[in-house]
């Protein structure tokens, strides 16, 4: 995933995206390795929001399809929603929750849903920032970067619903699980470290 410093001038990024911030040295090595990479910045995933309409459509599909991948996806998002609302009752879940990783996976499988450009990218070991630079050099990678979505967000979400509905994993078992307390906005009561990119609201 990652993010590009000031990819969107309306959303200033002063901190590194969490996945890169957590291990900047490894991120720098991977990006500069020469391995073919496609980066889907956090800035771009903000377009793919878990809307109330998407949530309700997923709920309806789960009810009609029984114990399938649809119900698994719905139960996962439902559990996240319940846990989030317990920790942050003052915040509307649908205002701040995005399909960060699912959209990155979608781009990996179907890159045509994103507007992709080739960029020279480096990772700053001190700040964790992922930045575009003017040319190649030591510690710099030549990376394909998703700069924006290539289709309307509702169309992408509908396509995701269709893809999930088409999956029929064998022997799926649904068991009650307890989602531990978590937060998107700083440390929770359990002492989880504060995540990076706190200035990026909503959708960190």
Question: Residue spans of the language-model regions?
Answer:
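Class I SAM-dependent methyltransferase SAM-binding "motif I" and its flanking Rossmann-like core
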Residues: 1-15
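Conserved phosphate- and dinucleotide-binding cores of soluble alpha/beta proteins
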Residues: 9-10, 22, 34
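Conformational coupling and interaction surfaces
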Residues: 18-21, 25, 37-204
